[in-house]
């Protein structure tokens, strides 16, 4: 799970928080409710995650409650990956 989290973190940092340290974006940092990601940015993250990890996320997985922190996103990815 660590690699999944780090890949997601690096994408968000490079795309939406250029110049920020990875120390400032923890696994439990709220992404949407804090304003780091707006709804369009969240869709971009969904697209990235689906392409990067070869998973299909549905609306349940991508609701604000379930797609608001890096750890939430990583959990959804791991749950959707083939065993």
Model-derived regions: residue spans:
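Conserved catalytic core of two-component sensor histidine kinases
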Residues: 43
């Amino acid at each position: 799970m660590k690699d999944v989290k780090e890949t997601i973190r690096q994408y968000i940092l490079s795309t939406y928080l250029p110049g920020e340290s990875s120390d400032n974006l923890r696994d439990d940092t709220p992404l949407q409710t804090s304003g780091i990601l707006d709804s369009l940015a969240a869709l971009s993250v969904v697209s990235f995650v689906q392409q990067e990890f070869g998973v299909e996320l549905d609306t349940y997985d991508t609701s604000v409650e379930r797609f608001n922190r890096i750890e939430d996103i990583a959990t959804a990815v791991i749950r959707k990956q083939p065993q």
